[in-house]
Each structure stands twice: as C-alpha cells, then as structure tokens.
A protein has these predicted regions:
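Extracellular glycoside hydrolase catalytic/binding regions
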Residues: 2-18, 22-149, 153-157, 162-182
Length: 182
C-alpha cells in the first residue's frame, strides 16, 4: 500500500490522475497458467481502494479483472461496493478478441459497471499480425456507443505491429511522420 499511499498523497486534488491499481491480473502461477480469481483480485482491490480513498475521495480508480482484464463479467456478478468513481478495465486486441468479448462488456454494463478500455490494439493479442480493420472498427463503434474511453497500445519502437513508432525513431521525440509506422 506504500506506493498507492505515496501516489494519492502526491497527486491529491489533481483532477486528471486516474489510478489503475492492477494491470492485467493474470497467472499467479505462470508455469501452470493458473489465473488469479475475481475473489482474490477483489480482496486486493478493496484494500488498495481503501488506502487511496483515505487520502483522495474523488479520483477515478480502475480495477482489473481476471484473464488479462477480460473477465469483466466476473466483476459484474460480484462488484466492489461502497465507493464512487470506480471503473473496471477491459482489454482487447481486435485480431484475437471478437464479439464474445464485447458480450462480456455488454453484460457488465447491463449490471451497472463502468468500463474503461485501458489497453487495446488492432492486431493479435501477441502484438503481431496484420491490423484487423473490420474488427477494430467494430470495437471502436461499440466503445463509442457505450461512452467507453480507450487507449491503444503502444507508443514504442519495438519491432512489432502494435508499436506506433519505427525502430529508427528517436526515443525521446519529437517524431516526424517518417518515424511513424505506416
């Protein structure tokens, strides 16, 4: 809790600070690929939320969900109660994640959860493959229809489809159009 207490104290009252308290809570056991359960994530999240709320009463706090922040339906069935300005994150990659994941989002919304897509991309979940334009457009339309904010991954210069910059781009900018991936 030391980190979140420090950050909440440092940024208290700064209206554009958003706390995402656990990015992609997945695989507590990487060898056997055993995911954290929603109950485990919820217990941790409630502790962190209480620490932040003790200092910062109104900031938006975003809670991750199992399976790389895809199982928002788990949170919808047992949401965190007693706090305002909570959101749950949903991550997708358009080449891999299709209508079935939007249906999980629809279910969470129908149960009253606020969603924020804090990571997404137009390619496959591994960051590679071609941009799936049709699926990306379907996701953007769905997010717009549901007033969901989103952030595409990633502003980096790695040699992968999801990187917006070419490996030759200066790491600290400024960037020209010739530094951007086509």
């Amino acid at each position: 809790m030391e980190f979140f207490t420090y950050m909440a104290t440092k940024y208290k009252g700064v209206s554009n600070v958003i706390y995402e308290i656990w990015n992609e809570p997945s695989y507590k056991d990487h060898i056997n690929q055993i995911d954290y359960t929603w109950a485990e994530i919820k217990e941790y999240s409630e502790t962190v939320i209480a620490a932040i709320r003790a200092i910062e009463k109104d900031a938006v706090i975003i809670v991750g969900t199992p399976r790389w922040s895809q199982n928002v339906d788990d949170a919808a069935n047992d949401p965190i109660l007693g706090y305002d300005n909570l959101m749950y994150t949903l991550h997708f990659y358009a080449g891999t994640h299709k209508e079935w994941l939007r249906q999980k989002g629809d279910y969470a919304i129908s149960k009253g959860l606020a969603l924020f897509v804090t990571e997404c991309g137009g390619m496959n979940a591994d960051g590679q493959g071609p941009i799936d334009v049709e699926s990306t457009e379907a996701w953007i339309e769905w997010m717009d229809e549901n007033d969901i904010s989103y952030a595409f991954w990633s502003i980096s210069d790695k040699e992968e489809t999801c990187s917006m910059l070419l490996p030759s781009a200066p790491s600290e900018g400024p960037w020209a159009d010739t530094d951007l991936r086509p």
